[in-house]
Amino acid sequence: MNYADIRPIDVANGPGIRVSVFVSGCTHACPECFNPEAWDFEYGAPFTQAEADQVLQALEKPYIKGLSLLGGEPCHPRNQEAVLDLVRQVRERFPEKDIWCYTGYLFEDLAAGKVGEHSRALLEQLDVLVDGPFVIGLKNLGLRFRGSSNQRIIEVRPSLERGEPVLWDETSVE
């Protein structure tokens, strides 16, 4: 897997101060995507253990709330294995930090294992999933942590337990 960017400080892609990893490679090709250069799977540089260590080091700071995964498409089958390895390392070392993931895929398809062999395992490591493609006709700049009204902010663990999406509480002060 390649990555487009690692931001050791990010306040736009989830609650609190976060570390964000932008992976390369996406096939959704959403019109007016904010990161179209990351559609190319070869864009950026290889994501190796050195980059994972950089992310882990950034997460050591006590004021960092968690990790956000964006793209590109973190849940694309070509990216799943590397993303899963990273989130497992984060979970092991920082169980108190939350992990958010932005994807153009739907929760239901990821949970059913319809999006690559690691989609369910990856989902099980996440706290929050922002799902659905960006749709320009549904763009709404007033939404928290997403760009269009079709996208959902989903609490992953209760959703997996119930077998249906449980939405994140947007009134949260985080």
Where are these regions (language model features)?
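Conserved Radical SAM active-site core
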Residues: 1-4, 17, 35-101, 105-119
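N-terminal pre-triad scaffold of radical SAM enzymes
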Residues: 2-29
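Conserved C-terminal portion of the radical SAM core fold
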Residues: 60-69, 91-98, 130-136, 160-174
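Glycine-rich nucleotide phosphate-binding loop and flanking beta-alpha elements
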Residues: 75, 136-137
